Amino acid sequence: MQYSIEINKNTEIFNIDKVAKQAAGAVLMRQGKSVVLATVAREEKQVEEDFLPLTVQYIEKAYAAGKIPGGYVKRETKPSDAETLTARIIDRSLRPLFPKGYAYPTQIVVMVLSADPKVDLQVMSLNAASVALYLSDIPMKAPVCGVRIGKIDGNFILNPNNEELQNSTLDLYVAGVKDELLMIEMRALPDQKENEIFIEAPYADVLTQTTSQNMNELSEDEILEALNLAQKAILNGSNAYEEAFSKHKKNSQIELKNEIEYPEILAFIENNFQKQIKEAINQMAKSERASELNKIAKEISNLEIAKEWSEESVLNTLAKVKRKLIRGQILNEGKRADGRSLNEVRPISIETNILPNAHGSCLFTRGQTQALVVATLGGENDAQMIDLLTEKNPISERFMVNYNFPGFSVGEASPIKAPGRRELGHGNLAKRALYPSVDENYPYVIRLVSEILESNGSSSMATVCGGSLALKAAGVPSLKLVAGVAMGLIFEDNKYAVLTDIMGLEDHDGDMDFKVAGSKDGVTALQMDIKLGGIDQETLKQALYQAKEGRIHILNIMEEAAKEIIVNEEVLPKLELFSVDPSKIVDIIGQAGKTIKEIVEKFGVSIDLDREKGEVKIAGSQNEQIKAAKDYIINITSSQKGTKKGSKDKDISGFELGQEFQGIVKKIAPFGAFVELKNGVDGLLHSSKSKHLNLSENQSLKVKISEIKNGKISVDLCE
């Protein structure tokens, strides 16, 4: 059965009861030339643990874009980072709608079978998964709808295609159901204004471009305006899906777990252990571990009255009392577990460049959350190559943020493994926040690594703060400092409280995790996950403005720390950027790359070439090596009279290894001297072989040929 729905600028075609009929729910969705299959499957037996056993997989098939997977294994293997991040978006959007007490292991799989470069696969995949879930026998009140908002020439655009998104200064992804928002991801997109200028250079006149960059932060009011547009579109989409598919939804006969109450245990604990629990809460405010509650549970279990009580029932009841005390204290007294007011940021300490041999480093500590963020600068060859499904060629990622969360950061003895979804998600959020502050024309590739050394909430935002200062510490001319803060929400009995800089305890027992990052001029990135089943605009507005207050407080502290930064110039890589005649690039490369390999090996540098612009970028650890390599390249490409392009332009057929000549020094360069042998043919006497001599032009030297390679002659001094 096929349904065609015109909604939010898109024509979406759904086929139900056509494929994957053994699944609990399945749809084959088409939009443009993109086709995705979304399926939902669940087990019949509930898990005993008190959590939602939901897994989401998003898989891009290479054949969807007419490709064969690269590498030795010609099939899809582990998911790429992009696939993992899309799976997280789908998971975070759908998870809040599962009913309380649902405990069946459930898997949602979205497979991209055909990929149209013009279609937004993230939005399409979420909507397909939402409809498949709604069609299943899992009780859902309404279908979720996802939309993307862009901004071009100051105007907000609903569901921009990929081409429009390239020209957008905003990427806002929102998911919700009816008039409630469930998940938000936003990033500001910097734009470049290009100006062509003509430069008269010593070796080649070139037409080059200069650019100026705008970070394009959004104000809180602009974000709310964009969210209002998204909310209306979500309502339209959610209603359209419900109208089309409600009659096809399977009847739900799923049994939900009833929350087990232990009134006797609850009364006993509230009457006898309130003081100990409050003390435990104070301790837990300093750590993400629950060991304090376990101690109380053990103490209760040893009592005579508790002989008939299971350890699980005692622990569950303790957790409920703890949650009730924490939330009640916040809502009724405006006081938090660690004694802070609702809008108070934890104490901050900052140290920079504490690692003497790293390019830039920052130890950022906020309360009991600590991030060591390290910046490393590299050449173009250090960029991360990413193979995207809808791109013909791999793209180069020149700004990377890696986030690591070892077990010891929360006092756990767990093995350090490859990064999981959480690490990838937190690193991606920090990258989105910091990216607009880095000039896209900065010549170095940048890698930031965040090592979380201690965690009690908001470690991703500590990564943003530490990362911004680590860039400064590495001498990166970032446009503005960027800070981040995590906001929380407690909502109960029509009362709510917004919390600034939440700790782990408040994240666990709260109703929202809302991370906001930006400069003093606006927001560069935000991410919201809600546990309530939706949030209204008024609450969101308060959270945004309270986050601004906290962000500016943090930025003031960071600005003072930035003034004290001493850049360690000695360890920073050196770089020389210059232009040559683009037609001469082939001379620098040489036959099969022999010449450029020779230069790299001889001078210990890395070289990047732009064939179209004639730009040459040389990077290395020593200025002398870079200058010598530059002079060597200029000598190769120079067309001025009196300067030899190299012995390959002369007939060297009569020269042999070991031949001796009384030569004349014709030119001295930092890397050596060019000695004329005979018939205008030069040999290079490398500087390493003539350091003890004070050579001058026209000086007579006795030399012998030590190497003939690629039409060039190298010589040594005769003994």
From Swiss-Prot:
Main location: cytoplasm
UniProt-annotated location(s): Cytoplasm
Residue ranges of every copy of the S1 motif domain listed in the record: 658-719
One example of a Gene Ontology biological process annotation: mRNA catabolic process
E.C. designation(s): 2.7.7.8
GO MF terms, alphabetically ordered: 3'-5'-RNA exonuclease activity; magnesium ion binding; polyribonucleotide nucleotidyltransferase activity; RNA binding
Chain sites annotated for binding Mg(2+): D507, D513
Keywords per UniProt: Cytoplasm, Magnesium, Metal-binding, Nucleotidyltransferase, RNA-binding, Transferase
Gene Ontology annotations for the cellular component aspect, listed alphabetically: cytosol
Catalysed transformations (reactions): RNA(n+1) + phosphate = RNA(n) + a ribonucleoside 5'-diphosphate
Positions of the KH domain: 573-633
Enzyme category, top tier: transferase
A Pfam family assignment: S1
InterPro entries: ExoRNase_PH_dom1 (IPR001247), ExoRNase_PH_dom2 (IPR015847), ExoRNase_PH_dom2_sf (IPR036345), KH_dom (IPR004087), KH_dom_type_1 (IPR004088), KH_dom_type_1_sf (IPR036612), NA-bd_OB-fold (IPR012340), PNPase (IPR012162)
Cited CDD domains: KH-I_PNPase (cd02393), RNase_PH_PNPase_2 (cd11364)
NCBIfam families linked to this entry: PRK11824.1
Function per UniProt: Involved in mRNA degradation. Catalyzes the phosphorolysis of single-stranded polyribonucleotides processively in the 3'- to 5'-direction.
Family in the record: Belongs to the polyribonucleotide nucleotidyltransferase family.
Identification of the protein by name: Polyribonucleotide nucleotidyltransferase
Organism placement in taxonomy: Bacteria, Pseudomonadati, Campylobacterota, Epsilonproteobacteria, Campylobacterales
